């Protein structure tokens, strides 16, 4: 499915998926997440001009409507957000990680770890 804009929380997997798909976002970070990591995730994406952040305490129907209408009505900004989001995304991250693990494990081929007591 293709989306012009996502309105969502800012957990790590959500942010990563949006980046890989190049989907601009309005993030409403969950304020009670461990170590406030959702706010950190959202603010980073906002600092990269890939997203907008609305703190939950500021969220009203009018606020969200104004943000959505403003973004949907500004195709240049939405395209720039899409471009920035895509630049952040790592669509081949799993492949890169698998290759790195393969290289590391090759270094230890035949090595049997000694138990520690």
Region locations from a protein language model:
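Nucleotide-activated sugar donor-binding and catalytic core shared by glycosyltransferases
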Residues: 1-117
